[in-house]
């Protein structure tokens, strides 16, 4: 009888323990499972980094000369030098030998243009001679008085030993002939927010962005590397004519295409697109 009672109690104990080997009820005391499996492995979940705020690399140029270092006065009777450049020749071998330009065209390039290498040497030379770039609006002011509206020369405050210089770029429209004779083709805003030059290698026909071979971008880089060459961030001024557009974009009207010409609609659409494209530049 005792043996039967012991066997009966053992069977009841086994039946009590068996549910613990099966699936827990939703309302049971199941252990918590992390929602993100990576947490269980001790891994840190991926987090998208916040984009870094844009830092203007030329801010250091604009703030290089503090007011207490501008101890030299340059009055209205003293000369402010001026250098002007046409677009520079990025590929001189192509321009003067390989592009098929006529002899008179080559003479014209030699008379009115400089190569990118010559331009770089000129910048280095005026820098070493103590010149500093100034903004033309700091040199001249427009005033209105009893005699009317006119321009007056200002007195500049310069670092000791420096001489003021204005650089200007003429045309800056990148004529169609320039695209065939070894020049860059336009200015664009790069993904970094800075100005780049678009260029097509005349030998390989590869189009790319560069800061070499263009007067504007080369000066940007030179000033960035020599912040003491600029007063308050001054660089150059553009003397735009609007002839064949500006900055490499064909924004100009064409009076040879009549208003009622079938070609006018396509021309106006392209012109509007070019106007929008140049605005960020």
Tell what function each PLM region has.
Residues 17-37:
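Sec-dependent signal peptide cleavage junction
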Residues 33-81:
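N-terminal low-complexity, Pro/Thr/Ser-rich intrinsically disordered segments
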Residues 77-280:
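Active-site beta->alpha N-cap acidic-glycine motif
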Residues 3-24:
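Sec-dependent N-terminal signal peptides of Gram-positive bacterial secreted proteins and lipoproteins
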Residues 5-9, 68-73, 107, 226:
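Short, flexible coil/linker segments at or flanking structured domains
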């Amino acid at each position: 009888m005792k043996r039967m009672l012991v066997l009966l109690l053992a069977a009841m104990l086994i039946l009590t323990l068996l549910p613990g080997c099966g699936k827990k009820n939703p309302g049971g005391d199941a252990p918590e499972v992390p929602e993100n499996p990576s947490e269980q492995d001790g891994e840190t979940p991926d987090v998208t980094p916040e984009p870094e705020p844009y830092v203007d690399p030329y801010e250091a140029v604009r703030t290089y000369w503090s007011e207490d270092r501008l101890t030299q006065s340059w009055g209205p009777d003293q000369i402010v030098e001026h250098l002007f450049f046409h677009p520079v020749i990025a590929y001189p071998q192509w321009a003067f030998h390989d592009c098929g330009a006529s002899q008179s065209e080559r003479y014209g390039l030699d008379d009115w243009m400089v190569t990118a290498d010559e331009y770089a040497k000129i910048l280095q030379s005026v820098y070493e001679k103590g010149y500093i770039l100034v903004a033309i609006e700091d040199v001249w002011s427009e005033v209105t008085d009893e005699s009317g509206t006119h321009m007056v020369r200002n007195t500049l405050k310069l670092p000791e030993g420096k001489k003021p210089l204005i650089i200007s770029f003429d045309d800056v429209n990148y004529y169609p002939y320039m695209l065939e004779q070894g020049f860059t083709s336009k200015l664009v805003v790069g993904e970094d927010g800075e100005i780049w030059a678009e260029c097509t290698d005349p030998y390989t026909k590869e189009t790319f962005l560069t800061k070499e071979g263009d007067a504007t971008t080369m000066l940007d880089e030179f000033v960035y590397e020599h912040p003491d060459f600029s007063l308050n961030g001054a660089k150059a001024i553009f003397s735009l004519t609007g002839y064949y557009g500006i900055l490499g974009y064909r924004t100009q009207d064409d009076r040879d295409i009549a208003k009622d010409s079938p070609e006018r609609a396509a021309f106006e659409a392209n012109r509007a697109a070019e106007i929008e494209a140049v605005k960020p530049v």
